[in-house]
């Protein structure tokens, strides 16, 4: 079990025992005496621009096309991708609003779908620009879905009407499907292994590599505070290190770093 998981479980246990103390059920909180491990410093894997573009190509026309597109280009979380609805996409003003999520809970070995008009944090609810190449693909997919609905008639699953990530008969592309099938797609096409969530990290790393300020990346990804973004991606911000080196060299009258 990772240190992060231990910290998470400890926090929940501590909270429950704290409530028990308040109700005078126990004299003190034994969790106070437990030493928590230090949180792991996670360094994710990233795809570069060539790998992302090739991934777009091999996933086109598959059930993973849209999850990959939104995960890599917009840096959406899996829950945000699956929760995307057509009414959140404004084709006239070219905007996408991230406001609905879909997750799955494993209960008695069954995946239970949980949909909610909420996001991970308040900052996660955000509006992003609908760029032309994504717009063109979405319009084509929307037309395909409309045609599938007409062809299937009563056999079409209307439970998920309005969702973007659905298959030919209207079934939702489930969160666990994305997690299970993504590594299979990578292996089948000769990619190195990364997790689906690493597409979000790939998005951030490409932005940093192209000079996008950390603050803008925070807003793009929907992080609740700047420190979250900085803690995860500061080690990738090599351009800022070059700027710092230039400042030192200029101050010393030596030259520049590049």
Listing of model-derived features with the role each one plays in the protein:
Residues 1-25, 41, 172-177, 192-198:
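N-terminal core-binding DNA-recognition domain of tyrosine site-specific recombinases/integrases
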Residues 3, 57, 61-62, 74, ...:
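Short, basic (Lys/Arg/His-rich) helix/loop patches that form interaction surfaces
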Residues 20-30, 91, 100-107, 140-154, ...:
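Proline-centered turn/helix-capping motifs that create local helix->coil transitions or kinks
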Residues 53-54, 58-60, 107-115, 210, ...:
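DNA/chromatin major-groove-contacting recognition/catalytic segments
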Residues 93, 104-106, 111-125, 132-134, ...:
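C-terminal secondary-structure termini that scaffold catalytic or DNA-interacting sites
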């Amino acid at each position: 079990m990772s240190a992060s998981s231990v910290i998470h479980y400890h926090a929940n246990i501590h909270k429950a025992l704290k409530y028990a103390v308040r109700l005078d059920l126990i004299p003190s909180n034994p969790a106070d005496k437990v030493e928590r491990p230090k949180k792991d410093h996670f360094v994710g894997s990233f795809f570069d621009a060539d790998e992302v573009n090739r991934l777009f190509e091999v996933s086109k026309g598959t059930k993973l096309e849209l999850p990959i597109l939104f995960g890599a280009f917009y840096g959406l979380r899996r829950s945000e991708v699956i929760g995307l609805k057509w009414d959140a996409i404004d084709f006239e003003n070219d905007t996408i609003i991230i406001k609905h999520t879909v997750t799955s809970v494993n209960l008695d070995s069954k995946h239970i779908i949980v949909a909610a008009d909420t996001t991970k944090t308040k900052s996660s609810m955000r509006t992003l620009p609908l760029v032309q190449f994504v717009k063109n693909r979405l319009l084509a997919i929307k037309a395909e879905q409309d045609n599938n609905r007409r062809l299937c008639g009563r056999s079409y699953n209307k439970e998920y009407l309005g969702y973007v990530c659905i298959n030919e008969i209207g079934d939702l592309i489930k969160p666990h499907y994305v997690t299970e099938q993504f590594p299979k797609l990578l292996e089948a096409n000769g990619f190195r292994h990364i997790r689906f969530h690493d597409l979000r990290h790939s998005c951030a790393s490409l932005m940093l590599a192209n000079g996008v300020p950390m603050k803008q990346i925070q807003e793009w990804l929907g992080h609740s505070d700047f420190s979250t973004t900085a803690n995860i991606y500061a080690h990738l911000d090599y351009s800022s290190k070059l700027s710092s080196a230039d400042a030192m060299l200029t101050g010393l009258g030596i030259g520049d770093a590049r």
